[in-house]
Swiss-Prot record:
This is E3 ubiquitin-protein ligase TRIM34B. PANTHER family: E3 UBIQUITIN-PROTEIN LIGASE TRIM. It comes from Mus musculus (Mouse). PROSITE patterns: B302_SPRY, ZF_BBOX, ZF_RING_1, ZF_RING_2. It is found in: Cytoplasm; Mitochondrion. The gene is Trim34b. It catalyses: S-ubiquitinyl-[E2 ubiquitin-conjugating enzyme]-L-cysteine + [acceptor protein]-L-lysine = [E2 ubiquitin-conjugating enzyme]-L-cysteine + N(6)-ubiquitinyl-[acceptor protein]-L-lysine. It comes from the Eukaryota. Zn(2+) binds at C96, H99, C118, H124. Belongs to the TRIM/RBCC family. Its main location: cytoplasm. One of its GO terms (biological process) is defense response to virus.
Length: 485
C-alpha cells in the first residue's frame, strides 16, 4: 500500500539548536529532535536533581530515561553526510551543477532535483524537500494511479467498442431478418399470384373451349341447312325448264316441301364472358396466408384409427387414406372414423384432402353422453345428419350432393340447425384448427389460401377431443395430408 506522503527532509534532518545536520539525534517527548551534544551543552536544558530536563525549543519537561535515539533519521543523516564527504560518487549527470554535490533531494515547490547544499540555500529555504527516492516513489505511485485509471478508461473504451460492434452485428441481423421477411412475403405473393393466374387462365380456357364448341356446332348445323336449301333451289330451277304438263303433274310435292322449310337458327351464344377478371386483394390474400402459416405451426401428425372400423370402410396401408366401398347390400349411416390421437389441452391443426369427394363430413368429436338416435327414418334426414350438433359432441361441417356445403349448429329440437355458407372456391383441401384453451374449432379453406370457412366458439371439451371424419358412401378417397405437403 502506498505511503500517505513523503517526509520533509529539511525539517527532519536539521537540529533546531545548532541549525546543522543532526548528530546522534535524540527524540524528546515533545516530538522535537536535537543533537545529543546540543542537548547536553544547551543552558536551557538544565537537569534538575530529580533527573528531569526541559526541551531547549519549547521548554517541555522530559525524563532522561525516556530519551530515544531515532535510528531511521540517523541513517538518513548518515547518507547525507556521506554525500558531503564523498562528492565524487556517481556520474556527472547526478551532480549539482552549482555545488558539485550529488542530487539526492527534490524540491516540491520548484519541481527540481537538488543537492543538500541547495536545500540549505536561501533559494530553497522554507520549501518542502524530500529524499530523491521518496519523490521518485511518490511519482511512481502517481504514475501507477494514472496508469490504472487510464487502463480502466481503456477497458471502458474497449467495452464501448465491443458494444458498438455487437450493436452493428445485431443491426445487421435485424436488417437481414427483415430483408428475408420481405423477400419471403413477396415470394409468397408471387406464388399466390402465379396460382391465381393459372386458375383464372384455366377458367378462361374452359369457357373459351365451351363457347368455341357451341359455335362450331352452330356452324355445322348452318352448313347442313345451307346445303339443303341449295339443293331445293337447284331442284326448283331445274323444274322451271320442264314442260307445262310435267310441271303441273309434279308441282304439288316440291312446292309443299319448299314452302314448309324454314331456317332453324342455332342457339344463341353469349357475346360476353361469364366472369370478368378482377385483380385480387393482395394484402388480404397475404394476411390469410400468414394466418394459415401461423396455425400450421401447431400441425399434428396422426393417422386414422383402425379400431372399430366400419365394414364399409377401407384404410390404406399407412392409415392415412380412407375409402368407402359397398361391401354390404344395406346403406350404413354411420361411416364415421376417428383420428389416432385425442387432445385435452393445447392447440392442434390438421388438413384433409377431399378434392375427389362429393360428400364428406369433417371436424371434432368428444364423448358427452350415450346418444339415443331415433331409429325411424326422418323425412329430409335419412342419412344420419341429425346427430351432428355441438350439444351431442360434434363440431363439424360437410358437403352434400356435390355442391351443398353445410355447417351443423345447435338447435332447440332434435335436428341440428344447418347453415349453408357461400364458398367462392370449392373445398378441395380443408384445414381444422382446435384450440382447447379458447374452446374454438376453426375450419379453413386451404384451397383459397386459408380463408376462414366457419368458427365454432364456446366449445365445451369435458372429455378428450378426437379428430372426426365421415367419407359417407362416396367411393372417392379421403386423405389426411402429411406435414408440409
Amino acid at each position: 500500500m502506498a505511503s500517505t506522503g513523503p517526509t520533509n527532509i529539511q525539517e527532519k534532518t536539521t537540529c533546531p539548536v545548532c541549525q546543522e545536520l543532526l548528530t546522534k539525534a535524540l527524540s524528546l517527548g515533545c516530538g522535537h529532535l536535537v543533537c545529543q551534544a546540543c542537548l547536553i551543552s544547551n543552558k536551557n536544558a538544565v537537569i534538575n536533581p530529580r533527573g528531569k530536563s526541559s526541551c531547549p525549543v519549547c521548554g517541555t519537561r522530559f525524563s532522561l530515561e525516556n530519551l530515544q535515539a531515532n535510528k531511521h533519521l540517523a541513517n538518513v543523516v548518515e547518507r547525507l553526510g556521506e554525500v558531503k564527504l564523498k562528492p565524487d560518487i556517481g556520474t556527472k549527470r547526478d551532480l549539482c551543477v552549482h555545488h558539485g554535490e550529488k542530487l539526492l533531494l527534490f524540491c516540491k515547490e520548484d519541481k527540481k532535483v537538488i543537492c543538500w547544499v541547495c536545500e540549505r540555500s536561501q533559494e530553497h529555504r522554507g520549501h518542502h524537500t524530500f529524499l530523491w527516492e521518496e519523490a521518485v516513489r511518490e511519482c511512481q505511485e502517481n504514475l501507477q494511479k494514472a496508469l490504472t485509471r487510464l487502463r480502466k478508461e481503456q477497458e471502458k473504451v474497449e467495452t464501448l467498442e465491443a458494444d458498438i460492434k455487437e450493436d452493428r452485428l445485431s443491426w445487421k441481423r435485424q436488417v437481414q431478418t427483415e430483408r428475408q421477411r420481405i423477400q419471403t412475403g413477396f415470394n409468397q405473393l408471387r406464388r399466390i399470384l402465379d396460382k391465381e393466374e393459372q386458375r383464372e387462365l384455366k377458367r378462361l380456357r374452359e369457357e373459351e373451349q365451351m363457347i368455341l364448341d357451341s359455335l362450331a356446332g352452330a356452324e355445322a348445323e348452318l352448313a347442313q341447312q345451307s346445303q339443303l336449301v341449295e339443293e331445293l333451289i337447284s331442284d326448283l330451277e331445274l323444274r322451271r325448264e320442264w314442260s307445262d304438263t310435267e310441271l303441273l303433274q309434279d308441282m304439288s310435292g316440291i312446292l309443299k316441301w319448299s314452302q314448309i322449310w324454314t331456317l332453324k337458327k342455332p342457339k344463341a351464344v353469349s357475346k360476353k364472358l361469364s366472369m370478368v377478371f378482377q385483380a385480387p386483394d393482395l394484402s388480404g390474400m397475404l394476411q390469410k396466408f400468414r394466418e394459415l402459416s401461423a396455425v400450421r405451426a401447431y400441425w399434428d401428425n396422426f393417422t386414422f384409427n383402425p379400431e372399430n372400423l366400419n365394414l364399409n370402410l377401407i384404410l390404406s396401408e399407412d392409415h392415412r387414406q380412407v375409402t368407402s366401398v359397398s361391401i354390404w347390400p344395406f346403406k350404413c349411416c354411420n361411416n364415421g372414423i376417428l383420428g389416432s390421437k385425442c387432445f385435452s389441452s393445447g392447440k392442434h391443426y390438421w388438413e384433409v384432402d377431399v378434392s375427389e369427394k362429393n360428400a364428406w363430413t369433417l371436424g371434432v368429436y368428444t364423448r358427452k353422453r350415450t346418444l339415443r338416435f331415433d331409429v325411424r327414418q326422418r323425412k329430409g334426414q335419412p342419412n344420419g345428419y341429425h346427430r351432428y350438433k355441438p350439444q351431442n359432441g360434434y363440431w363439424v361441417i360437410g358437403l352434400q350432393h356435390g355442391s351443398k356445403y353445410s355447417i351443423f349448429e345447435d338447435s332447440s329440437n332434435c335436428d341440428p340447425t344447418v347453415l349453408n355458407p357461400f364458398v367462392a372456391t370449392p373445398l378441395h383441401r380443408v384445414g381444422i384448427f382446435l384450440d382447447c384453451e379458447e374452446g374454438t374449432v376453426s375450419f379453413l379453406n386451404v384451397t383459397n389460401h386459408g380463408s376462414l370457412i366457419y368458427k365454432f366458439s364456446q366449445c365445451c371439451f369435458s372429455q378428450p377431443a378426437y379428430p372426426y371424419f365421415n367419407p359417407w358412401d362416396c367411393p372417392a378417397p379421403m386423405t389426411l395430408c402429411p406435414l408440409n405437403s
